[in-house]
Amino acid sequence: MNTLLERIESALIGPEPSVSEREMLQLSQLTLTRRSLTEGMLAIASIGRGKTTLLRTPLRAMLRDGWGGLIPTVKDSMIADMSECICAESRDADLILFDDKAHSVFNPFASITDINEAAALLTGVSEALNKGNHTGSDASFWKQQLQLVLRHLFALCQVQAGKLDLLLAATLFDSRAKTPAELQDPNWRTGNPMWAAIQSARASNDSDAGKAAHYFMETFPHQSGGLQSSLVATVEGVLDQLSREPLRSLFSGESTFSMRDLFDNGKICVVGLPVLSSDSGRIANAILQFCFCREAVKAKRDHHSFLILDEGQELVTTDLMEKMAVIREFKVAVFFLTQNLSVVDQRIGQLAREGLFGLMATRIFGPQNHAATRQWAAEQCGKGQQTAKSTSRSRSNRGSQSSSSETLSSRWDYICPPNQFAQLDIGETIVLRNDEIARVHWHPTHPGRGGSGRII
Protein backbone atom coordinates (compact mmCIF):
# COMPACT_ATOMS: atom_id res chain seq x y z
CA MET A 1 0.00 0.00 0.00
CA ASN A 2 2.77 2.40 0.91
CA THR A 3 4.51 1.60 -2.37
CA LEU A 4 1.34 2.45 -4.31
CA LEU A 5 0.98 5.78 -2.47
CA GLU A 6 4.61 6.59 -3.15
CA ARG A 7 4.10 5.94 -6.88
CA ILE A 8 1.03 8.16 -6.96
CA GLU A 9 2.90 10.90 -5.07
CA SER A 10 5.85 10.62 -7.45
CA ALA A 11 3.55 10.89 -10.46
CA LEU A 12 1.87 14.00 -9.05
CA ILE A 13 4.87 15.98 -7.78
CA GLY A 14 7.72 14.42 -9.77
CA PRO A 15 10.73 12.39 -8.65
CA GLU A 16 12.74 13.39 -5.60
CA PRO A 17 15.58 15.74 -6.58
CA SER A 18 19.14 14.45 -6.47
CA VAL A 19 20.98 15.12 -3.22
CA SER A 20 23.62 16.89 -5.31
CA GLU A 21 20.99 19.42 -6.39
CA ARG A 22 20.27 20.61 -2.86
CA GLU A 23 20.36 24.41 -2.90
CA MET A 24 23.15 25.91 -0.78
CA LEU A 25 23.66 29.59 -1.65
CA GLN A 26 21.63 32.42 -3.12
CA LEU A 27 23.88 35.02 -4.75
CA SER A 28 21.46 37.72 -5.90
CA GLN A 29 19.63 35.94 -8.76
CA LEU A 30 22.12 33.03 -8.92
CA THR A 31 21.40 29.82 -7.02
CA LEU A 32 24.29 27.49 -6.20
CA THR A 33 23.67 23.84 -5.34
CA ARG A 34 25.97 21.22 -3.89
CA ARG A 35 26.90 20.25 -7.43
CA SER A 36 27.60 23.89 -8.32
CA LEU A 37 30.07 24.19 -5.45
CA THR A 38 31.94 21.04 -6.48
CA GLU A 39 32.49 22.56 -9.93
CA GLY A 40 35.06 24.93 -8.44
CA MET A 41 35.02 28.52 -7.23
CA LEU A 42 37.61 31.21 -7.95
CA ALA A 43 37.70 34.46 -5.96
CA ILE A 44 40.15 37.14 -7.04
CA ALA A 45 40.55 40.52 -5.33
CA SER A 46 43.39 42.82 -4.32
CA ILE A 47 45.08 42.61 -0.91
CA GLY A 48 42.79 43.66 1.94
CA ARG A 49 39.74 43.92 -0.32
CA GLY A 50 37.46 41.29 1.17
CA LYS A 51 38.48 37.81 -0.07
CA THR A 52 38.27 36.25 3.39
CA THR A 53 35.01 38.12 4.04
CA LEU A 54 33.28 36.51 1.08
CA LEU A 55 34.78 33.09 1.88
CA ARG A 56 32.94 32.93 5.21
CA THR A 57 29.53 32.61 3.55
CA PRO A 58 30.12 29.50 1.37
CA LEU A 59 32.28 27.96 4.11
CA ARG A 60 29.54 28.30 6.71
CA ALA A 61 26.99 26.94 4.23
CA MET A 62 29.07 23.79 3.77
CA LEU A 63 29.74 23.46 7.50
CA ARG A 64 26.02 23.79 8.20
CA ASP A 65 25.40 21.03 5.65
CA GLY A 66 27.81 18.67 7.44
CA TRP A 67 30.73 18.78 5.03
CA GLY A 68 34.28 17.95 6.09
CA GLY A 69 37.50 19.04 4.46
CA LEU A 70 40.98 20.50 4.56
CA ILE A 71 41.96 24.13 5.14
CA PRO A 72 45.65 24.81 4.46
CA THR A 73 46.83 28.14 5.89
CA VAL A 74 49.20 30.77 4.56
CA LYS A 75 49.00 33.44 7.28
CA ASP A 76 48.59 33.22 11.07
CA SER A 77 45.31 35.16 10.94
CA MET A 78 43.71 32.46 8.79
CA ILE A 79 43.91 29.92 11.62
CA ALA A 80 41.75 32.04 13.92
CA ASP A 81 39.38 33.11 11.10
CA MET A 82 38.67 29.57 9.92
CA SER A 83 38.43 28.14 13.45
CA GLU A 84 35.94 30.86 14.36
CA CYS A 85 33.72 29.94 11.39
CA ILE A 86 33.81 26.27 12.35
CA CYS A 87 32.87 26.97 15.97
CA ALA A 88 30.14 29.43 14.92
CA GLU A 89 28.40 26.54 13.14
CA SER A 90 28.76 24.31 16.25
CA ARG A 91 31.28 22.08 14.49
CA ASP A 92 34.07 22.52 17.04
CA ALA A 93 33.90 18.79 17.88
CA ASP A 94 34.89 18.08 14.27
CA LEU A 95 37.81 20.52 14.23
CA ILE A 96 41.31 19.05 13.92
CA LEU A 97 43.92 21.75 14.50
CA PHE A 98 47.07 20.26 13.01
CA ASP A 99 50.06 21.62 14.90
CA ASP A 100 52.63 20.49 17.46
CA LYS A 101 50.72 22.08 20.37
CA ALA A 102 47.60 20.01 19.66
CA HIS A 103 49.66 16.77 19.59
CA SER A 104 48.28 15.94 16.15
CA VAL A 105 49.96 13.21 14.11
CA PHE A 106 49.46 12.33 10.47
CA ASN A 107 51.78 9.65 9.13
CA PRO A 108 51.45 9.79 5.32
CA PHE A 109 53.11 6.41 4.95
CA ALA A 110 50.47 4.70 7.04
CA SER A 111 48.36 4.59 3.87
CA ILE A 112 51.09 4.79 1.19
CA THR A 113 52.73 1.50 0.27
CA ASP A 114 53.68 2.24 -3.33
CA ILE A 115 57.20 3.63 -3.90
CA ASN A 116 56.00 5.71 -6.87
CA GLU A 117 53.38 7.44 -4.74
CA ALA A 118 55.91 8.03 -1.97
CA ALA A 119 58.32 9.56 -4.50
CA ALA A 120 55.53 11.76 -5.90
CA LEU A 121 54.75 12.98 -2.37
CA LEU A 122 58.29 14.17 -1.67
CA THR A 123 58.56 15.62 -5.18
CA GLY A 124 55.48 17.70 -4.41
CA VAL A 125 57.00 18.77 -1.10
CA SER A 126 60.20 19.85 -2.85
CA GLU A 127 58.12 21.80 -5.38
CA ALA A 128 56.42 23.68 -2.55
CA LEU A 129 59.66 24.24 -0.66
CA ASN A 130 61.51 25.56 -3.70
CA LYS A 131 58.48 27.57 -4.93
CA GLY A 132 58.76 26.21 -8.45
CA ASN A 133 62.35 27.38 -9.00
CA HIS A 134 62.90 24.79 -11.73
CA THR A 135 61.04 26.12 -14.76
CA GLY A 136 61.52 26.13 -18.51
CA SER A 137 62.78 23.35 -20.75
CA ASP A 138 64.78 21.53 -18.05
CA ALA A 139 61.94 21.42 -15.51
CA SER A 140 60.48 18.07 -16.61
CA PHE A 141 63.95 16.47 -16.87
CA TRP A 142 64.92 17.65 -13.40
CA LYS A 143 61.63 16.46 -11.92
CA GLN A 144 62.07 13.07 -13.58
CA GLN A 145 65.57 12.73 -12.11
CA LEU A 146 64.33 13.74 -8.66
CA GLN A 147 61.54 11.15 -8.73
CA LEU A 148 64.09 8.56 -9.86
CA VAL A 149 66.31 9.21 -6.82
CA LEU A 150 63.36 9.09 -4.43
CA ARG A 151 61.79 6.00 -5.98
CA HIS A 152 65.02 4.02 -5.66
CA LEU A 153 65.57 5.35 -2.14
CA PHE A 154 62.14 4.13 -1.02
CA ALA A 155 62.71 0.78 -2.74
CA LEU A 156 65.75 0.29 -0.50
CA CYS A 157 63.64 1.29 2.53
CA GLN A 158 61.09 -1.38 1.70
CA VAL A 159 63.62 -4.16 1.29
CA GLN A 160 65.55 -3.15 4.41
CA ALA A 161 62.67 -2.46 6.82
CA GLY A 162 59.66 -4.02 5.10
CA LYS A 163 57.92 -0.64 4.97
CA LEU A 164 58.26 2.95 3.79
CA ASP A 165 59.86 5.11 6.45
CA LEU A 166 60.92 8.76 6.21
CA LEU A 167 63.53 8.58 8.95
CA LEU A 168 65.14 5.48 7.43
CA ALA A 169 65.11 7.16 4.01
CA ALA A 170 66.95 10.14 5.51
CA THR A 171 69.51 7.84 7.14
CA LEU A 172 70.13 5.88 3.94
CA PHE A 173 70.52 8.96 1.77
CA ASP A 174 72.84 10.63 4.26
CA SER A 175 75.11 7.56 4.28
CA ARG A 176 75.26 7.11 0.47
CA ALA A 177 78.57 6.94 -1.41
CA LYS A 178 79.38 10.39 -2.78
CA THR A 179 81.95 9.16 -5.32
CA PRO A 180 82.81 5.88 -7.12
CA ALA A 181 86.02 5.69 -5.07
CA GLU A 182 84.15 5.94 -1.78
CA LEU A 183 81.84 3.15 -2.91
CA GLN A 184 84.83 0.81 -3.15
CA ASP A 185 86.33 1.90 0.19
CA PRO A 186 86.19 -0.97 2.76
CA ASN A 187 86.03 1.59 5.58
CA TRP A 188 82.90 3.16 4.05
CA ARG A 189 81.24 -0.21 3.65
CA THR A 190 81.83 -1.28 7.25
CA GLY A 191 78.69 -0.63 9.27
CA ASN A 192 77.28 1.70 6.60
CA PRO A 193 73.42 1.70 6.46
CA MET A 194 73.30 2.36 2.70
CA TRP A 195 75.72 -0.47 1.93
CA ALA A 196 73.71 -2.83 4.14
CA ALA A 197 70.54 -1.87 2.25
CA ILE A 198 72.27 -2.37 -1.11
CA GLN A 199 73.42 -5.83 -0.04
CA SER A 200 69.89 -6.74 1.09
CA ALA A 201 68.50 -5.47 -2.22
CA ARG A 202 70.99 -7.48 -4.28
CA ALA A 203 70.14 -10.61 -2.31
CA SER A 204 66.37 -10.20 -2.72
CA ASN A 205 64.20 -11.27 -5.63
CA ASP A 206 62.53 -7.86 -5.81
CA SER A 207 63.18 -6.23 -9.19
CA ASP A 208 62.62 -2.70 -7.83
CA ALA A 209 65.15 -3.34 -5.07
CA GLY A 210 67.67 -4.68 -7.59
CA LYS A 211 67.29 -1.58 -9.76
CA ALA A 212 67.69 0.62 -6.69
CA ALA A 213 70.94 -1.12 -5.70
CA HIS A 214 72.30 -0.69 -9.23
CA TYR A 215 71.27 2.98 -9.27
CA PHE A 216 73.12 3.89 -6.07
CA MET A 217 76.16 1.82 -7.06
CA GLU A 218 76.51 2.61 -10.77
CA THR A 219 74.39 5.62 -11.74
CA PHE A 220 74.14 8.16 -8.96
CA PRO A 221 77.85 8.34 -7.99
CA HIS A 222 78.77 8.93 -11.68
CA GLN A 223 76.26 11.71 -12.41
CA SER A 224 77.51 15.12 -13.51
CA GLY A 225 78.46 17.43 -10.68
CA GLY A 226 75.80 20.06 -11.35
CA LEU A 227 72.88 17.63 -11.59
CA GLN A 228 74.01 15.57 -8.61
CA SER A 229 74.56 18.67 -6.47
CA SER A 230 71.09 19.99 -7.32
CA LEU A 231 69.40 16.66 -6.56
CA VAL A 232 71.35 16.19 -3.33
CA ALA A 233 70.49 19.69 -2.11
CA THR A 234 66.79 19.11 -2.82
CA VAL A 235 66.51 15.63 -1.30
CA GLU A 236 68.60 16.53 1.74
CA GLY A 237 66.62 19.74 2.23
CA VAL A 238 63.30 17.88 2.34
CA LEU A 239 64.48 14.89 4.39
CA ASP A 240 66.37 17.10 6.84
CA GLN A 241 63.26 19.16 7.56
CA LEU A 242 61.15 16.02 8.02
CA SER A 243 63.74 14.53 10.37
CA ARG A 244 63.66 17.51 12.74
CA GLU A 245 60.99 18.98 14.99
CA PRO A 246 58.21 19.93 14.68
CA LEU A 247 57.73 17.90 11.48
CA ARG A 248 59.29 14.73 12.89
CA SER A 249 56.59 14.41 15.57
CA LEU A 250 53.80 15.57 13.26
CA PHE A 251 54.49 13.12 10.41
CA SER A 252 55.86 9.97 12.07
CA GLY A 253 54.39 7.49 14.50
CA GLU A 254 50.75 6.52 14.85
CA SER A 255 48.28 8.86 13.16
CA THR A 256 45.60 10.55 15.26
CA PHE A 257 43.38 10.99 12.18
CA SER A 258 43.22 9.92 8.55
CA MET A 259 42.12 11.55 5.31
CA ARG A 260 39.08 9.27 5.38
CA ASP A 261 37.94 11.11 8.50
CA LEU A 262 37.74 14.30 6.43
CA PHE A 263 35.86 12.65 3.57
CA ASP A 264 33.59 10.18 5.36
CA ASN A 265 33.23 11.45 8.93
CA GLY A 266 32.86 15.21 8.44
CA LYS A 267 36.11 16.17 10.16
CA ILE A 268 37.70 19.53 9.31
CA CYS A 269 41.49 19.85 9.42
CA VAL A 270 42.96 23.35 9.78
CA VAL A 271 46.73 23.37 9.34
CA GLY A 272 48.19 25.23 12.31
CA LEU A 273 51.59 25.89 10.70
CA PRO A 274 51.15 28.71 8.15
CA VAL A 275 53.10 28.57 4.89
CA LEU A 276 54.66 32.00 5.35
CA SER A 277 55.80 31.37 8.92
CA SER A 278 58.56 28.85 8.11
CA ASP A 279 59.72 26.08 5.79
CA SER A 280 58.07 23.67 8.24
CA GLY A 281 54.74 25.34 7.54
CA ARG A 282 55.26 25.14 3.79
CA ILE A 283 56.10 21.42 3.99
CA ALA A 284 53.24 20.57 6.39
CA ASN A 285 50.66 22.22 4.13
CA ALA A 286 52.12 20.54 1.03
CA ILE A 287 52.01 17.04 2.55
CA LEU A 288 48.43 17.33 3.80
CA GLN A 289 47.22 18.86 0.53
CA PHE A 290 48.94 16.13 -1.51
CA CYS A 291 47.44 13.34 0.60
CA PHE A 292 44.00 14.98 0.52
CA CYS A 293 44.01 15.22 -3.29
CA ARG A 294 45.27 11.65 -3.69
CA GLU A 295 42.66 10.24 -1.30
CA ALA A 296 39.89 12.31 -2.91
CA VAL A 297 40.06 10.50 -6.24
CA LYS A 298 40.42 6.96 -4.91
CA ALA A 299 36.72 6.21 -4.41
CA LYS A 300 33.26 7.66 -4.97
CA ARG A 301 31.66 8.80 -1.71
CA ASP A 302 28.25 9.68 -0.31
CA HIS A 303 29.47 12.77 1.55
CA HIS A 304 30.61 16.11 0.17
CA SER A 305 33.89 17.73 1.23
CA PHE A 306 35.91 20.87 0.53
CA LEU A 307 39.45 22.16 0.01
CA ILE A 308 39.94 25.85 0.87
CA LEU A 309 42.95 27.53 -0.75
CA ASP A 310 43.07 31.12 0.52
CA GLU A 311 46.11 32.91 -0.94
CA GLY A 312 46.14 30.01 -3.38
CA GLN A 313 49.24 31.24 -5.21
CA GLU A 314 51.23 29.97 -2.22
CA LEU A 315 49.54 26.56 -2.27
CA VAL A 316 49.09 25.61 -5.92
CA THR A 317 51.02 22.51 -7.00
CA THR A 318 51.33 20.30 -10.06
CA ASP A 319 49.37 17.56 -8.28
CA LEU A 320 46.50 19.95 -7.52
CA MET A 321 46.28 21.03 -11.17
CA GLU A 322 46.21 17.39 -12.30
CA LYS A 323 43.47 16.47 -9.84
CA MET A 324 41.28 19.54 -10.46
CA ALA A 325 40.03 18.12 -13.76
CA VAL A 326 38.41 15.11 -12.06
CA ILE A 327 38.04 16.01 -8.39
CA ARG A 328 34.49 17.36 -8.85
CA GLU A 329 33.33 13.85 -9.76
CA PHE A 330 34.21 12.82 -6.20
CA LYS A 331 32.03 15.52 -4.55
CA VAL A 332 34.94 17.75 -3.56
CA ALA A 333 34.55 21.53 -3.75
CA VAL A 334 37.75 23.51 -4.35
CA PHE A 335 37.83 27.21 -3.44
CA PHE A 336 40.79 29.10 -4.85
CA LEU A 337 41.30 32.66 -3.59
CA THR A 338 44.09 34.91 -4.83
CA GLN A 339 45.09 38.55 -5.39
CA ASN A 340 45.65 38.92 -9.13
CA LEU A 341 46.90 37.12 -12.22
CA SER A 342 50.51 38.19 -11.79
CA VAL A 343 51.11 36.45 -8.45
CA VAL A 344 49.81 33.14 -9.84
CA ASP A 345 51.73 33.47 -13.13
CA GLN A 346 54.92 34.03 -11.14
CA ARG A 347 54.41 30.70 -9.40
CA ILE A 348 53.17 28.36 -12.16
CA GLY A 349 53.31 30.36 -15.41
CA GLN A 350 50.56 31.84 -17.56
CA LEU A 351 49.56 28.70 -19.46
CA ALA A 352 49.18 26.61 -16.30
CA ARG A 353 47.21 29.41 -14.64
CA GLU A 354 44.85 29.66 -17.62
CA GLY A 355 44.26 25.92 -17.43
CA LEU A 356 43.65 26.00 -13.67
CA PHE A 357 41.28 28.97 -13.76
CA GLY A 358 39.44 27.42 -16.69
CA LEU A 359 38.36 24.59 -14.37
CA MET A 360 36.57 27.00 -12.00
CA ALA A 361 32.89 27.23 -12.98
CA THR A 362 32.05 30.08 -10.58
CA ARG A 363 34.27 33.17 -10.66
CA ILE A 364 34.01 35.97 -8.14
CA PHE A 365 35.68 39.27 -8.98
CA GLY A 366 36.27 41.68 -6.10
CA PRO A 367 37.86 45.16 -5.92
CA GLN A 368 40.93 45.09 -8.13
CA ASN A 369 43.84 47.52 -8.53
CA HIS A 370 45.85 45.35 -10.96
CA ALA A 371 45.18 46.62 -14.49
CA ALA A 372 45.82 43.34 -16.33
CA THR A 373 43.52 41.47 -13.94
CA ARG A 374 40.74 44.05 -14.44
CA GLN A 375 41.05 43.62 -18.20
CA TRP A 376 40.99 39.82 -17.86
CA ALA A 377 37.90 39.96 -15.62
CA ALA A 378 36.09 42.13 -18.17
CA GLU A 379 36.96 39.66 -20.93
CA GLN A 380 35.66 36.75 -18.84
CA CYS A 381 32.30 38.47 -18.46
CA GLY A 382 32.19 39.00 -22.22
CA LYS A 383 30.74 41.61 -24.53
CA GLY A 384 27.22 42.48 -25.59
CA GLN A 385 25.10 45.15 -27.17
CA GLN A 386 25.34 48.19 -24.89
CA THR A 387 23.06 51.20 -25.21
CA ALA A 388 24.72 54.61 -24.95
CA LYS A 389 22.87 57.92 -24.51
CA SER A 390 24.27 61.19 -25.83
CA THR A 391 22.80 64.66 -25.28
CA SER A 392 23.32 67.68 -27.52
CA ARG A 393 22.34 71.30 -26.81
CA SER A 394 21.95 74.24 -29.20
CA ARG A 395 21.12 77.97 -28.95
CA SER A 396 19.54 80.41 -31.37
CA ASN A 397 21.68 83.08 -33.02
CA ARG A 398 20.47 85.68 -30.53
CA GLY A 399 21.13 83.34 -27.64
CA SER A 400 17.67 83.81 -26.17
CA GLN A 401 16.45 80.29 -26.85
CA SER A 402 18.08 76.90 -26.35
CA SER A 403 17.11 73.35 -27.18
CA SER A 404 18.45 69.93 -26.35
CA SER A 405 18.08 66.50 -27.84
CA GLU A 406 18.98 62.98 -26.73
CA THR A 407 20.21 60.23 -28.99
CA LEU A 408 20.35 56.53 -28.12
CA SER A 409 22.93 54.41 -29.89
CA SER A 410 23.84 50.75 -29.67
CA ARG A 411 27.41 49.45 -29.63
CA TRP A 412 29.28 46.21 -28.95
CA ASP A 413 31.17 46.64 -25.66
CA TYR A 414 32.14 44.94 -22.38
CA ILE A 415 29.21 43.93 -20.20
CA CYS A 416 31.38 44.79 -17.18
CA PRO A 417 34.01 47.37 -18.26
CA PRO A 418 37.50 47.02 -16.70
CA ASN A 419 37.17 50.21 -14.64
CA GLN A 420 34.08 48.78 -12.94
CA PHE A 421 36.27 46.32 -11.02
CA ALA A 422 38.33 49.20 -9.64
CA GLN A 423 35.21 50.95 -8.36
CA LEU A 424 33.90 48.06 -6.23
CA ASP A 425 33.87 48.57 -2.46
CA ILE A 426 35.08 45.98 0.06
CA GLY A 427 32.51 43.18 0.17
CA GLU A 428 31.14 44.03 -3.28
CA THR A 429 31.76 41.53 -6.07
CA ILE A 430 30.73 40.62 -9.57
CA VAL A 431 29.96 36.90 -9.84
CA LEU A 432 30.15 35.04 -13.15
CA ARG A 433 28.75 31.54 -13.55
CA ASN A 434 28.43 30.13 -17.05
CA ASP A 435 26.76 33.01 -18.92
CA GLU A 436 25.04 34.52 -15.87
CA ILE A 437 26.39 37.61 -14.11
CA ALA A 438 25.30 38.93 -10.71
CA ARG A 439 26.44 41.74 -8.46
CA VAL A 440 26.75 40.33 -4.93
CA HIS A 441 27.43 42.06 -1.62
CA TRP A 442 28.93 39.88 1.13
CA HIS A 443 28.17 41.04 4.67
CA PRO A 444 31.36 41.35 6.79
CA THR A 445 29.84 40.56 10.20
CA HIS A 446 26.76 38.46 9.36
CA PRO A 447 27.93 36.02 6.66
CA GLY A 448 25.06 34.24 4.97
CA ARG A 449 22.39 36.52 6.47
CA GLY A 450 23.22 40.11 5.61
CA GLY A 451 24.05 41.28 2.10
CA SER A 452 22.90 39.60 -1.10
CA GLY A 453 25.07 36.49 -0.66
CA ARG A 454 22.89 34.28 1.53
CA ILE A 455 22.84 30.73 2.86
CA ILE A 456 19.72 28.82 1.87
Predicted regions: what they are:
Residues 2-28, 32-332, 411, 416-450, ...:
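P-loop NTPase motor domains
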Residues 324-433:
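Conserved ATP-driven motor cores of ASCE-family P-loop NTPases powering translocation/secretion/packaging/pilus
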